[in-house]
Amino acid sequence: MSKKAVIAGAGPAGLACATYLAGAGWSVDVFSNEENTESCLAEASIVKNYPGFPNGIEGVELLGLFVEQAQNAGVAIHPEGISSVHSDDKYIIDTNGAMHSYDEYVEAVGCRRREYRCDGLELIPVHYCAICDGGLYGKEDVVVVIGGGDTAISSALYLSNLVKMVVMVVRKPNCRFTNKKAFDELCSKRNVVIEYETQLHHVSSNGKGNPVLHLMHKNQCSDEMIVGAKGLFVCIGCESNVVEHVGNGRIWRCGDCSNDKKQVAIAVGDGARVALDIIGA
């Protein structure tokens, strides 16, 4: 009888790990739901730095190829999450009341978006995915993007093609990015304004139903007001998801929940590494 492995998370790391294990003769189940293990890769408009795609590829398409390859290898993917993990000699997995037993458990649950908090935020629509919600806005609208990393840059770029103006609010004195070409393209956009060393302090109303965003610049006593912004896109990083674990069994982890690089290529390699470690254990 083949050994059985269960993987929490159907992103690049989890699917790479599953594909390698299945190729080695393991029986592999992958559990994933939208709340805590759905891959952020599906939200990427274009991935230009993953090897094998010289012209880039949409995130959702790349993820679909990962899924197809895993399923072709014999991996079973289930659209439900794991509630808890109990481990002694075996790993007992609880999926909404149904119990399953496995020889090994891999956590590839990715991360969840970090929320932004300030007074009055309920006065303006807040979004955490430009690809998902950017289409809600048009050429007459102004939107604000909070953040200064790769996700904020790609989100601002995407939105700049949809709306009248994008105001990017960056807390630090510069942006931090891995794709200089994307950042240079963003800087060349005439409808993008980048406010460095600035934070959104609070949101108020102008009395006519329109939100007013109050930005505070470093070392300045007065705030700058943005009147008429229609939406706010928050891109300030993410936090690792966790699954409740009871027992002394080892937990294998791979992907974004175990490193801070947040790169598809690293996640895939990490998943492959964990699979090889399991096979050789």
Please describe what each predicted stretch is.
Residues 2-33, 129-176, 222-223, 239-281:
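Rossmann-like dinucleotide/flavin-binding elements
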Residues 1-8, 23-24, 36, 74-141, ...:
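FAD-binding core/adjacent interface of flavoenzyme oxidoreductases
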Residues 7, 28-31, 77, 93, ...:
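Hydrophobic beta-strand residues in large extracellular and virion-surface proteins
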